[in-house]
């Protein structure tokens, strides 16, 4: 397999991945355009594109309500944005391939671990902020000593593993999907005989990858809402 890398630019001694930045911006732009288009001329009785938008929003709302309860309305928009970003980002790499012998210019943003860990850290940051807002900084920090002070290392480790598992699960599934797609594209140009087989396999794999992309976005908001719910429901569960 040919080795290609994403073009980068250095700023203040930090290398920025131009492909990932561009694809992330494209993902955000697609979300904005779709939501803007679907929400134009909204009616009391939804139909067509408005119906699809409301269905997705209700799907997210119903999913996170299991973990957030009466706090659902406070986080429904955040979870809708997270779901939309992860789902579209997961599937961008399936649309086409754009590369030279040296550089790759098209990929799924979530096939990059930096994007996934950033999303996970964002969720963790919100969890801690909401925990402090709910219990106060003293009460929140005291929670790390529950049920006994001896549990402090385990409670801290749990916070780290939550972030790592959220990022690694997403990265592993999407990155491996792009690797298989790349192998099928190479199989297509290997010989005239493997072309039709690769084409058929690629159609099946693309459909399967889109399904996996949806499942990963769905799991991402389930886990994110679960982590946030644990922080805001802490006192109520005790």
From Swiss-Prot:
Topology in the lipid bilayer: Multi-pass membrane protein
Record field: transmembrane: 18-38, 75-95, 112-132, 179-199, 203-223
Keywords: ATP synthesis, Cell membrane, CF(0), Hydrogen ion transport, Ion transport, Membrane, Transmembrane, Transmembrane helix, Transport
Coiled coil location: none
Gene Ontology terms, MF aspect: proton-transporting ATP synthase activity, rotational mechanism
Any one annotated GO CC term: proton-transporting ATP synthase complex
GO biological process, one term: proton motive force-driven plasma membrane ATP synthesis
InterPro entries per the UniProt record, alphabetical: ATP_syn_F0_a_bact/chloroplast, ATP_synth_F0_asu, ATP_synth_F0_asu_AS, F0_ATP_A_sf
Localization: Cell membrane
Pfam family, one: ATP-synt_A
Role noted for this protein: Key component of the proton channel; it plays a direct role in the translocation of protons across the membrane.
Subunit note: F-type ATPases have 2 components, CF(1) - the catalytic core - and CF(0) - the membrane proton channel. CF(1) has five subunits: alpha(3), beta(3), gamma(1), delta(1), epsilon(1). CF(0) has three main subunits: a(1), b(2) and c(9-12). The alpha and beta chains form an alternating ring which encloses part of the gamma chain. CF(1) is attached to CF(0) by a central stalk formed by the gamma and epsilon chains, while a peripheral stalk is formed by the delta and b chains.
Family listed: Belongs to the ATPase A chain family.
Name of this chain's protein: ATP synthase subunit a
Record organism: Streptococcus agalactiae serotype V (strain ATCC BAA-611 / 2603 V/R)
Lineage of producing organism: Bacteria, Bacillati, Bacillota, Bacilli, Lactobacillales
